[in-house]
Design a protein with these regions (language model features):
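Short, solvent-exposed polar/charged micro-motifs at secondary-structure junctions
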Residues: 51-54, 131-135, 168
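Flexible, glycine-rich loop/tail regions that form catalytic "lids" or insertion modules at the edges
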Residues: 125, 151, 161-169, 194-201
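Short, amphipathic C-terminal "tail helix"
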Residues: 170-171, 175-201
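Residue-level recognition of short, well-ordered coil/turn positions
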Residues: 35-38, 119, 170
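Juxtamembrane helix-loop transition sites at the ends of transmembrane segments
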Residues: 36, 157, 190-193
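Conserved beta-loop-beta/alpha segment of the NTase-like Rossmann-fold superfamily
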Residues: 1-60, 85-86, 94-95
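Catalytic-core segments of class I nucleotidyltransferases/pyrophosphorylases
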Residues: 10, 24, 31-32, 63-162, ...
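Generic helix-packing signal
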Residues: 4, 34, 147-148, 169
Length: 201
């Protein structure tokens, strides 16, 4: 388990897709939790087949009680998604993770270490949020169909990195237009151009 620095950080699994209005506010809250409160945050999502996932159990106040990796008898129906925020010092803790009974280095073990120090919070992704794990061919197809339907019906691009960077002031209008040129007259390139020119919906 490798973390590139010992600063507060976020980690997301590459085959996970998150979608929902206001998601950026949830991320900012988790980032603040890691940077200023020295606490880790995991994200819970209700599923019907919890035995397939890492699971988080919590009380009525949202306090985390336990985390388990693919339990035979799940204590809740809330899986732990592939998005994590950790405070400074995570590298040292990650180096202490030992292989599980399955012979793997489990992220759940790291989360349990934070829980034992009473430094683990869970943020639930409720109605209005979609979490898609694209780790199988079927789930990848489902995610592709979801993105296509949302994009066509609502006429907007889901998660355009350049558009997000422009929105938050990380790049300026000229840099966005330069990025758009790389995509030529493709729908994505035209979308970035429209955003830069203030013509996007």
């Amino acid at each position: 388990m490798l973390f590139r620095s010992d600063e507060a950080c976020a980690m997301v699994l590459g085959d996970n897709i998150f979608f929902g209005d206001g998601f950026s506010h949830i991320l900012k809250k988790a980032a603040d939790n890691a940077e200023n409160k020295n606490r880790a945050t995991i994200f819970g999502y209700h599923v019907n087949d919890p035995e397939r996932f890492g699971i988080v159990e919590f009380d009525k106040d949202g306090k985390v009680l336990s985390v388990e990796e693919k339990p035979k008898h799940p204590k809740s129906n809330y899986c732990i998604t592939g998005l994590y925020f950790y405070p400074a010092g995570v590298s040292k803790m990650a180096n202490e993770v030992k292989p599980s009974a399955r012979g793997e280095l489990e992220i759940t073990t790291l989360n349990d270490m934070y829980l034992k120090e009473d430094r683990l919070d869970v943020q639930l992704l409720g109605r209005g949020y979609a979490w898609l794990d694209t780790g199988t061919m079927d789930s990848l197809l489902e995610a592709s169909n979801f993105v296509q339907i949302i994009s066509k019906r609502q006429n907007f691009v889901i998660s355009a990195p350049e558009e997000i960077a422009f929105k938050y002031g990380w790049i300026d209008r000229d840099e966005l237009l330069e990025s758009a040129k790389h995509y030529g007259k493709s729908p994505y390139g035209e979308h970035l151009k429209a955003v830069a020119e203030g013509k996007a919906e």
